[in-house]
């Protein structure tokens, strides 16, 4: 009679891993508004998350869960690759990553919308005013490309990281596309 291999520990190098029980790994944003909202949600559920002031990379949550504190934009990749079992991040970041993850639950926070902006002295006053061939700067090139393709608008996507709003002011692009929780204009 052969024992089930699923119940035996597996020896891998110098580390012993048990296949009978392990903590659920949850990837959580390590900073920003999304991290603050997530910490509050988990605290309300009886799973207090450490303050990020301690610079921890991970923490146990109630003995059954392990929190992994990572950049919000890396969470889709960590979940898709199996580094984390589940994650909390923005849907905009999931869409941009193009990673095969499943959306399970809308937590009711972190809502934002895709916006386009141009300089105040620009002829562009709406999405429809963006001329063919216009340069559009964004830190969300995949989402922006899909958006303009769906509208049959031929634009040149200029991928940038960080503060996209500087691009029109520097002449890098005529328009920016980003996600925002508020209305704003370039000056």
Question: What is each model feature region?
Answer:
Residues 18-187:
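Domain-level signature for soluble enzymes in the chorismate/prephenate branch of the shikimate pathway
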Residues 1-8:
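Short alpha-helix boundary/capping segments
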Residues 8-9, 22:
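Low-complexity, intrinsically disordered segments with a bias for serine/threonine
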């Amino acid at each position: 009679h052969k024992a089930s291999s699923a119940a035996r520990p597996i020896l891998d190098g110098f580390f012993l891993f048990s296949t009978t029980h392990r903590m659920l790994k949850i990837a959580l944003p390590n900073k920003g508004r999304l991290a603050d909202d997530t910490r509050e949600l988990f605290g309300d559920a009886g799973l207090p998350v450490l303050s990020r002031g301690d610079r921890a990379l991970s923490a146990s949550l109630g003995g059954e869960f392990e929190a992994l504190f990572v950049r919000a934009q890396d969470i889709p990749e960590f979940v898709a690759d199996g580094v984390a079992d589940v994650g909390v991040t923005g849907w905009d970041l999931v869409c941009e990553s193009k990673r095969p993850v499943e959306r399970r639950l809308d937590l009711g926070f972190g809502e934002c919308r895709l916006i386009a902006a141009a300089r105040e002295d620009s002829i562009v006053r709406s999405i429809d005013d963006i001329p063919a061939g216009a340069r559009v700067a964004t830190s969300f090139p995949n989402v922006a490309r899909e958006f303009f393709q769906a509208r049959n608008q031929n634009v040149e996507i200029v991928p940038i990281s960080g503060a996209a709003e500087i691009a029109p002011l520097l002449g890098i692009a005529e328009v920016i596309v980003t996600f925002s929780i508020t209305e704003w204009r370039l000056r």
